[in-house]
Each structure stands twice: as C-alpha cells, then as structure tokens.
From Swiss-Prot:
Entry's family note: Belongs to the TatA/E family.
Origin organism lineage: Bacteria, Pseudomonadati, Pseudomonadota, Gammaproteobacteria, Vibrionales
Organism of derivation: Vibrio vulnificus (strain CMCP6)
Subcellular localization, as worded in the UniProt entry: Cell inner membrane
Name recorded for this polypeptide: Sec-independent protein translocase protein TatA
Main location: membrane
Sequence ranges of Basic and acidic residues compositional bias: 47-59
Bias (Polar residues) ranges: 60-69
Database matches in InterPro entries: TatA/B/E, TatA/E
Length: 78
C-alpha cells in the first residue's frame, strides 16, 4: 500500500506524452537504443582485444633464429 499502482503509472505516462509529444519520445528512445547498442559493441571489441592479447609472443631470439633458418632454406633452393 505504499507502492505505486498501475493507475498512477498510467497517469504519469499520459502526462509525459502530453508534455514531450510522441515524436520527441520516439527520438529519445531511438537515441537511447543507439547508445546502448554502441556500448555493447564497444564492450565486445574490448573482450576480443583481451582474447587476442592472451597469447604469449615469441621472444626476439626465437624470431631471429626462425628468420635465419628461413633465409638459409631460401638460399639453398635458389
């Protein structure tokens, strides 16, 4: 009995529609939806970047050894 009834919510909704109009409310709704969509997209991109960064890169020594062996193979084939 201290809560808001459905009738009170309905009266508040009617007052809001009368004050702002349906066009403005529709615009606010689409802006809010776009903001939520952009937020979700940014969160997904951040998670994918974390997944990409989880691997451990090869050390410089391993990369230089690999490059040296590849260049030797290229010279032998030529």
């Amino acid at each position: 009995m201290g809560g808001i009834s459905i009738w009170q919510l309905l009266i508040i909704a009617v007052i809001v529609v009368l004050l702002f109009g349906t066009k403005k409310l529709r615009g606010i709704g689409s802006d809010l939806g776009g903001a939520i969509k952009g937020f979700k997209k940014a969160m997904n991109e951040e998670e994918s970047e974390k997944k990409d960064a989880d691997f451990e890169p090869k050390s410089l020594e391993q990369q230089s050894k690999q490059a040296a062996t590849e260049s030797k193979k290229d010279k032998e084939q030529a």
